[in-house]
Amino acid sequence: MRASNYLFSTLRDAPTDAVVTSHQLMIRAGMIRQVSKGLYTWLPTGLKVFRKIENIVRDEMEKAGSLEVMMPGVQPAELWQETGRWQKYGPELLRLQDRHGREYCLGPTHEEVITELARNELTSYKQLPMNFFQIQTKFRDEVRPRFGVMRSREFCMKDAYSFHVGAESLQETYDIMHKAYCNVFDRIGLNYRPVRADTGSIGGAYSHEFHVLADSGEDDIAFSDSSDFAANIELAEAICLKEKADAPTQDITEVFTPDCKTIAKVAEFLKLDVTSTVKTMLIKAVDENDQPTIAALVLRGDHNINEIKVEKLAGVVIPFEFADEADIIAKTGCAPGSIGPKGLAEKGIRVIADRSAAVMSDFCAGANKDDYHFTGLNWERDCAEFEVADIRNVVEGDPSPDGQGTIVIKRGIEVGHIFQLGQQYAEALKATVLDENGKAQVMHMGCYGIGVSRIVAAAIEQNFDEKGILWPESIAPFDIAIVAMNYDKSEAVRTECDRLYAELKAKGLDVLLDDRKERPGVKFADCELLGIPHRLVVGDKGLEKGTLEYKYRKAGDNEDIAIADAVEFILSKK
């Protein structure tokens, strides 16, 4: 590509509304432009990177045995109503009507449509397993689209779906797709982790997320410093090595704690370490007769509640929701901020203590009396009726759940998610095949998603410096830039640039020949901003010496190379 025929929309300054690095650099490098909140046009440079990622994804899907299809972006409400997700999905599902009043949605995902295809086209066990994929635009009506293409309303995703006679076959394909995802991210050149994850609104019993490690990530991922264990913090089990509480050494004492509505203020007022306190939170629940009630969650003062874990407990209202203050006062006799476990069971409130809280002794907790707390509280002696469950987030230094090493927590950007869906969609949509005995069997399903457009941003978040983007070479918009000094004025420069351009292109490289009438500094700055890995500078002075100036984007120094060796030199660097 000759730069004189290319769209350079580079900017020296980042827009004020771009918060994360990837958004800033994608705007500055002329990769995207915003059309509306959460909606972007991809310009040539951005689309070149996008296509390279797309091609890697497509290649690995085909190697994994997946067949490419293309499904409609607009989906009929009837399919979503059959699975029950029309009501459950929430406002992220953009719903619309046609001129006849028929309801549709813009597809955020395609489980319903692909299962409709499978129930019509797959009739015999002999056709299974079958794996389909597509690379297509999705739409989710995000309440707060932000971070550029990282969390936009419209985005491109590769979604694949597999169909099986049984769970064993599903597991085999799941493992193949897991490996294919690792191959994708290895080929791109990202530092990533596959982690166990919650299945969320998609459903199913088993899933893994793939996270690119970056400080700007929205998710916390926990992994062992000594093994392969890795899980989303929502799913990582919090291990407590202590088996039971120590014997009491203090008497229970009621203490006046004015205006201490938080654990931090209570600990400061009483001059206690926060680890010797517990916090008690009341949430909405249902009793054994399915009637509304409240339940109490008790955690050590420095720990945070894990809503996903709590939602898996019997009797908890889903989605997780704290109890209303009026109900709290009616049930406990005090306002939030002074609530503790002592006496709650006697008031008919179910008490659930986290594992770490359940082995504490002589601790401080609310006295269920406004502006008062207890010190010297002990479970068996003072509040013996309680359950124990894992309801907190892991923290750094916790034992790894696999027994090897301790937990380290890093921020991650989710770029892929795979699920074992089981039979929930196939059952809802009556997708069956005949087995070897001629009996109808509900198919098992797997679902596998990769955020193609999101990978572009995630790669930048992991690869940049003060000058611009440091692309992994596999997805850089150009492999090499030939920067011409006075291309329009020097015949020698023009001849050598054209020769190099033709030879490097013939070797299969993606080449940018910068033949613009711009100052050298502008050309160099654009090369660095765009993250082009290799740069050759062709000028009259170098030609007189028989040399070209070479620079590798990720290194600081320039070096002179012989003109005769230039093509082979560049190929050796690839």
Swiss-Prot record:
CDD domains: ProRS-INS, ProRS_anticodon_short, ProRS_core_prok. Its EC number is 6.1.1.15. One of its GO terms (biological process) is prolyl-tRNA aminoacylation. Coiled coil: none annotated. GO terms for molecular function: aminoacyl-tRNA deacylase activity; ATP binding; proline-tRNA ligase activity. It is found in: Cytoplasm. GO terms for cellular component: cytosol. Keywords: Aminoacyl-tRNA synthetase, ATP-binding, Cytoplasm, Ligase, Nucleotide-binding, Protein biosynthesis. It catalyses: tRNA(Pro) + L-proline + ATP = L-prolyl-tRNA(Pro) + AMP + diphosphate. InterPro entries: aa-tRNA-synt_IIb, aa-tRNA-synth_II, aa-tRNA-synth_II/BPL/LPL, Anticodon-bd, Anticodon-bd_dom_sf, Pro-tRNA-ligase_IIa, Pro-tRNA-synth_IIa_bac-type, Pro-tRNA-Synthase_IIa_type1. Belongs to the class-II aminoacyl-tRNA synthetase family. ProS type 1 subfamily. Catalyzes the attachment of proline to tRNA(Pro) in a two-step reaction: proline is first activated by ATP to form Pro-AMP and then transferred to the acceptor end of tRNA(Pro). As ProRS can inadvertently accommodate and process non-cognate amino acids such as alanine and cysteine, to avoid such errors it has two additional distinct editing activities against alanine. One activity is designated as 'pretransfer' editing and involves the tRNA(Pro)-independent hydrolysis of activated Ala-AMP. Consists of three domains: the N-terminal catalytic domain, the editing domain and the C-terminal anticodon-binding domain. Homodimer. HAMAP family: Pro_tRNA_synth_type1. This is Proline--tRNA ligase. It comes from Marinomonas sp. (strain MWYL1). The gene is proS.
